[in-house]
């Protein structure tokens, strides 16, 4: 994965973390995602950034999806 792509992924992960007020997201890094999962992560990022707020169950589902997308 290129340095630019890694930086973009780290930015998306950080934005998701901030939007959801997730404290332990720091354990997830761009290197944790395979190239096959990048499109899914980008879709998840777009969905999170469009919503203004999340229910606790939605936040849990997003965290589970992030975990599932890891290598």
Curated annotation (Swiss-Prot):
It holds the Pfam family DUF1128. Belongs to the UPF0435 family. This is UPF0435 protein BLi00816/BL03111. It comes from Bacillus licheniformis (strain ATCC 14580 / DSM 13 / JCM 2505 / CCUG 7422 / NBRC 12200 / NCIMB 9375 / NCTC 10341 / NRRL NRS-1264 / Gibson 46).
């Amino acid at each position: 994965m290129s340095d630019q792509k890694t930086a973009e992924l780290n930015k998306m992960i950080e934005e998701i973390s901030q939007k959801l007020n997730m404290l332990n997201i720091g354990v997830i890094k761009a290197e944790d995602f395979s190239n096959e999962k990048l499109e899914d992560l980008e879709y998840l990022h777009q969905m999170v950034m469009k919503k203004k707020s999340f229910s606790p169950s939605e936040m849990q589902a997003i965290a589970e999806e992030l975990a599932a997308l890891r290598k």
